[in-house]
């Protein structure tokens, strides 16, 4: 996992981190980005990644606490087939407010994010859907925020975002003073 791609749009989009995209069929995140955004090149799953994915799917599909929550609230169990690994080298690597509203994830995507390494805060805000396009990417304009929560993502924690969460909330990893590395393994269903 040493061949992470640097997001060369970092100065333009404000997203500073390294990333690697895995997809079971080795598809690009978006075919139109294939030649312009090389950090979205797809890599084939390895055994370790596949085992982590199977464990997450088992927990949300069966009579576990997580599975019971999915059942109680009629949350669709995703057919996870992709994983974006973000590498935050230190506390200065971050991602700006965003949400995952791409057609390639479906109308109401379920996102399962596993944190490994340093503890970081995830900020969640309610939003007014107001976007502008930057190099083909949807970037949130500043909108009215009614809700603002910071969640502590510790080593080994699993964050689930499901239902209409991507429509009504943005999320970001905020900067801090840490000098330690954090990995975020974000599993989801990629449908295109």
Please place each PLM-identified region on the residue numbering.
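Non-heme Fe(II) oxygenase metal-center motifs and adjacent flexible, charged/small-residue loops
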Residues: 1-192
């Amino acid at each position: 996992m040493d061949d992470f791609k640097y997001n060369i749009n970092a100065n333009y989009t404000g997203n500073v981190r390294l990333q690697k995209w895995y997809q079971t069929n080795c598809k690009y995140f978006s075919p139109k980005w294939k030649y312009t955004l090389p950090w979205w090149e797809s890599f084939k799953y390895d055994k370790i990644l596949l085992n982590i994915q199977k464990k997450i799917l088992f927990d949300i599909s069966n009579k576990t606490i997580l599975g019971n929550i999915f059942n109680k609230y009629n949350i669709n169990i995703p057919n996870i087939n992709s994983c974006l690994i973000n590498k935050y080298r230190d506390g200065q690597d971050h991602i700006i407010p965003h949400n995952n509203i791409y057609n390639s994830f479906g109308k109401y995507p379920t996102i399962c994010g596993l944190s490994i390494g340093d503890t970081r805060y995830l900020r969640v805000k309610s939003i007014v859907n107001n976007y502008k396009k930057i190099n083909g990417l949807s970037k949130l304009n500043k909108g009215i925020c009614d809700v603002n929560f910071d969640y502590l993502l510790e080593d080994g924690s699993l964050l689930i975002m499901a239902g209409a969460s991507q429509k009504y909330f943005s999320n970001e990893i905020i900067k801090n003073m840490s000098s330690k590395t954090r990995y975020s393994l974000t599993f989801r269903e990629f449908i295109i």
